[in-house]
Amino acid sequence: MSELKIGTTVRLTNGRTCKVKKELGRGGQGIVYAVDYGGKDHALKWYTAPDIINSKAFYKNLSNNVNAGSPAPNFIWPLAVADPQLGSYGYVMALRPKGYEDMSQFILCHAQFDNVHAQLNACLQICAAFQRLHALGYSYQDMNDGNFFINPKTGDALICDNDNVAPDGYNNGIGGKAGYMAPEIVEGKTMPNKFTDYYSLAVCLFILIYMNRPFEGQWYLSCPCDNNPEMAKKLFGFSSVFIMDPTDAKNRPVRGVHNNKEMGYLSCSACQCFLQDFQQSGYQ
């Protein structure tokens, strides 16, 4: 495992350096550090997963993304790539601004939107950002609740973990997260692409509006499938059942589990007023 020590100076391909200040967090792919880059605080994602460290294709795609630049302001896009060193590499990005919450915190009710306007603004900003990404010929490939930072007061949305973005039709071996992957990926029929992005986007939008997961109702809760790939295929593949399916009731919400008030109500008049304002503003 290639961890960095506090005070380590990391060389970047643009001829500059960044200096590690502290660890911010870690996950399956690597560790995120706070760094000094050009005299300002930034973040450095440093890979520890061997399949990424040893992938020349992943490194090349990451470098290409840096050179191409961000497709929209909502993306916390890679700013600079580290030269391979100290047994690994990584990339520099902006830090998350204050006032933003992980999308997962909304699902857990640890964060709440101030109003419906902010809630729908988050949805529309995310849609607009991915529309631009797809228009430039990219696909995101691994969209899930861990990719979004949202301001609960305004609904302003930021998109992180953009190292998996690649030209549509090209894949670095990333499949996605259970519950967010399109059925055709779950069933092994295709790799992620812009069309499977649409499915993942729909799941994320449903969660942001209703604060519940669209395929995790009574049927899902009755099936212990954490280590059963075949059962996972049934629950999230072509046999999946929408939690609000009008004809199949086996996966309906469960009282005592699906308690978020948005599950049963979202003001239609508020939605209509917001969408009218959105159209009139000429949001680009």
Which residues are covered by each model-predicted region?
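Conserved structural core of kinase catalytic domains
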Residues: 73-122
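Conserved C-lobe activation region of Hanks-type protein kinase-like domains
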Residues: 205-271
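Conserved catalytic-loop aspartate of Hanks-type protein kinases
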Residues: 197
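Conserved activation segment of eukaryotic-like protein kinases, specifically the C-terminal portion
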Residues: 171-188
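Catalytic-loop of the protein kinase fold
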Residues: 130, 134-152
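ATP-binding glycine-rich phosphate-binding loop
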Residues: 2-39, 71
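Activation of the activation-loop gatekeeper triad in protein kinase-fold domains
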Residues: 160-166
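Conserved beta3-strand ATP-binding lysine motif
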Residues: 45-49
